[in-house]
Amino acid sequence: MTRQFLEFEQPIEELNQKIEALRMVGSDNEVNLSEEIARLEAKCSELTENIFSRLEPWQIAQMARHPLRPQTTDYIERIFTDFQELHGDRSYSSAPAIIGGMARLNGEPVMVLGHQKGKRTKEKVYRNFGMARPEEYRKALRLMRMAEKFKMPVVTFIDTAGAYPGIGAEERNQSEAIARNLFAMSRIKTPIVCIVTGEAGSGGALAIGVGDKIIMLQFSIYSVISPEGCASILWKDASKASEAARAMGITADRIFENELVDMVVPEPLGGAHRDVDEMASRLKRLLTSELQALKKVPLDQLIELRYQKFMAMGACD
């Protein structure tokens, strides 16, 4: 896979270019450059660790939006088996901005669904860049109710800039679809685990984000509005997005400190896109243990604990 580097990763990119140049030279003649390549690789790893240990909130937001960031389909392929996609809300359309269906996790049936932004231009347009419309949320709710009926746990992957704000979506009652999902998910009698893998934008994320366990990846973000949007409103200047990101507390660490999520999962060095297999492996182990624990909780107690979890958010002494 071709690597893409963000602006703050420029020193890492320069070192990688030197390493690749030495590899090409070494393959063209009999000069042994393995020691020099190994030295530069060690230096590159050290530099990467140093840069990523002190990222600013705005830089983390850029990581959450990285064009190579793993998407729902990447995790489905690596974590689950026997995935059978289910389409449509049975009222309007196939609803492709959210992908979902039945699968198996270690042989056990689960319902898995999540935002899908798309990777190439044609797919991005088809997926509406991962911005769900009312039909996507109604489709998601249909699948979750099916999971409840067949006693399957639900796993959701959240990665969206927000719910689609188009006229058509509003005409089809976007706010009602989101509100209905919030209400229904708080009462669905089956374990629900929600994972924020990239950016989680406001109600568009919450509509599939009410669960028994809420998990964020290390370089994911959760916010009521994008940093650019916040800066445009407060300072009438989108270029102040960095300042807005710092003030909003959108990073996984800050969200965890505020007790809005249950845990933060460390990513491979340089981000989840650097080693998708390892990231998926970590999530698979975590999902396995969390679902095993949740299945042992009586359903009535599970629903009460879920309700109390969200009612406690934002409470002050």
Swiss-Prot record:
User: What protein am I looking at?
Assistant: Acetyl-coenzyme A carboxylase carboxyl transferase subunit alpha
Question: Do the record's keywords include Cytoplasm?
Answer: yes
Please describe the quaternary structure of this protein.
Acetyl-CoA carboxylase is a heterohexamer composed of biotin carboxyl carrier protein (AccB), biotin carboxylase (AccC) and two subunits each of ACCase subunit alpha (AccA) and ACCase subunit beta (AccD).
Enzyme Commission number, as recorded = 2.1.3.15
- Which reaction does this chain catalyze? N(6)-carboxybiotinyl-L-lysyl-[protein] + acetyl-CoA = N(6)-biotinyl-L-lysyl-[protein] + malonyl-CoA
Tell me what organism the protein belongs to. Answer: Legionella pneumophila subsp. pneumophila (strain Philadelphia 1 / ATCC 33152 / DSM 7513)
As for family, the record states: Belongs to the AccA family.
Q: Which gene encodes it?
A: accA
Pathway where it operates:
Lipid metabolism; malonyl-CoA biosynthesis; malonyl-CoA from acetyl-CoA: step 1/1
Task: Provide one Gene Ontology biological process annotation.
Answer: fatty acid biosynthetic process
**Catalytic EC class:** transferase
Keywords assigned by UniProt, alphabetized: ATP-binding, Cytoplasm, Fatty acid biosynthesis, Fatty acid metabolism, Lipid biosynthesis, Lipid metabolism, Nucleotide-binding, Transferase
